[in-house]
């Protein structure tokens, strides 16, 4: 009994381990002969090759059902939303005009970075001159793709006082900040203008949710109706997708707040006006509109 329970010495365990790794008598490596290792390796090669083939075939079949230029399902994008620039961590434009540019320089830098692609030299290289007031239709012919599709020019000069050309601080230094509004891109979407407002553009209007008198006067660039509404020309629609229209230029409406009351949190709501865009849905506050906070601290 004592012999059965006797512990193996370290040298015995090392010998057993060496014999397991390579047994010269049976010519086995880790308990298997060379032919056994070859068979098991062949099995796994065939097994994983089969799995790879099945996965590749499934992926290929799925890709045949997908249009690489247009998403198959886009029902949730029927009503595009709006976004603001400068783009910061939150939808807030809060700064001070006390002469120190540390509170507003980040907004200026953000707008400079955004609008550098809207310089005339860049736009003339990437886009073409389109006919204002009409859709920029570039239809395909059957299975023949009309690609790459051309993009219309959008020069930063049309943003007027908010272009960063005449006023390099976009009004932030003087307490008259500019905010750029853009509409989210939806492939093949054709907004229908409201003819009472404009025949050639969809319009954007910004108001205060709390008190319009405190928000003061607003200028829009580009605009219609004597600058009472911002305007996005129909020639920037439709958008055909990044793959088909790689140089597409996103149009903006610049909103300049001329005399907003300082030291007040202004809840600003901007809506896009088009016959086929719903901007009144109480369940989705960002459908056809955008809401942001603006505050200009007192001197």
From Swiss-Prot:
It holds the Pfam family Na_K-ATPase. Disulfide bonds join 130-152, 162-178, 206-270. One of its GO terms (cellular component) is sodium:potassium-exchanging ATPase complex. InterPro entries: Na/K_ATPase_sub_beta, Na/K_ATPase_sub_beta_sf. Belongs to the X(+)/potassium ATPases subunit beta family. PANTHER family: SODIUM/POTASSIUM-DEPENDENT ATPASE BETA SUBUNIT, SODIUM_POTASSIUM-TRANSPORTING ATPASE SUBUNIT BETA-2. This is the non-catalytic component of the active enzyme, which catalyzes the hydrolysis of ATP coupled with the exchange of Na(+) and K(+) ions across the plasma membrane. The exact function of this glycoprotein is not known. Some specific sequence of the beta subunit can modulate the activation of the Na,K-pump by extracellular potassium ions. This is Sodium/potassium-transporting ATPase subunit beta-2. Residues 1-36 are cytoplasmic. NCBIfam families: Na_K_ATPase_bet. It comes from the Eukaryota. It comes from Rhinella marina (Cane toad). The chain crosses the membrane at residues 37-57. GO terms for biological process: intracellular potassium ion homeostasis; intracellular sodium ion homeostasis; potassium ion import across plasma membrane; sodium ion export across plasma membrane. Keywords: Cell membrane, Disulfide bond, Glycoprotein, Ion transport, Membrane, Potassium, Potassium transport, Signal-anchor, Sodium, Sodium transport, Sodium/potassium transport, Transmembrane, Transmembrane helix, Transport. Glycans are attached at residues 101, 119, 199, 226, 247, 259. Residues 58-299 are extracellular. The sodium/potassium-transporting ATPase is composed of a catalytic alpha subunit, an auxiliary non-catalytic beta subunit and an additional regulatory subunit. GO terms for molecular function: ATPase activator activity. It is found in: Cell membrane. Expressed at a high level in bladder epithelial cells and eye and at a trace level in kidney; it is not detectable in significant amounts in the stomach, colon and small intestine. It is a single-pass type II membrane protein.
């Amino acid at each position: 009994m004592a012999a059965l329970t006797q512990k193996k010495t370290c040298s015995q365990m090392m010998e057993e381990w060496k014999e397991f790794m390579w047994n010269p008598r049976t010519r086995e490596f880790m308990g298997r002969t060379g032919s056994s290792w070859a068979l098991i390796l062949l099995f796994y090669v065939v097994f994983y090759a089969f799995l790879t083939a099945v996965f590749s075939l499934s992926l290929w079949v799925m890709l045949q059902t997908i249009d690489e230029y247009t998403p198959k399902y886009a029902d949730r994008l029927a009503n595009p939303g709006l976004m603001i620039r400068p783009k910061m961590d939150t939808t807030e434009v809060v700064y001070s005009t006390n002469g120190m540019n540390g509170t507003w320089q980040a907004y200026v830098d953000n707008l400079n970075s955004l609008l550098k692609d809207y310089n005339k030299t860049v736009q003339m290289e990437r886009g073409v001159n389109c006919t204002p007031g009409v859709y920029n239709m570039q239809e395909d012919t059957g299975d023949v793709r009309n690609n790459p599709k051309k993009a219309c020019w959008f020069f930063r000069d049309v943003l007027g006082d908010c272009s960063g050309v005449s006023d390099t601080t976009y009004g932030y230094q003087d307490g008259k900040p500019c905010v750029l509004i853009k509409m989210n891109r939806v492939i093949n979407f054709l907004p229908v203008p409201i003819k009472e407002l404009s025949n050639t553009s969809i319009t954007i209007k910004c108001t205060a949710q709390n008190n319009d008198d405190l928000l003061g006067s607003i200028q829009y660039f580009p605009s219609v109706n004597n600058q009472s509404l911002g305007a996005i020309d129909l020639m920037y629609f439709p958008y055909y997708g990044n793959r088909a229209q790689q140089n597409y230029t996103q149009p903006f409406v610049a909103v300049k707040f001329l005399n907003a009351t300082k030291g007040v949190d202004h809840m600003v709501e901007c809506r896009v006006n088009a016959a086929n865009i719903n901007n009144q849905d109480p369940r989705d506050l960002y459908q056809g509109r955008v809401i942001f906070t603006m505050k200009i601290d007192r001197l």
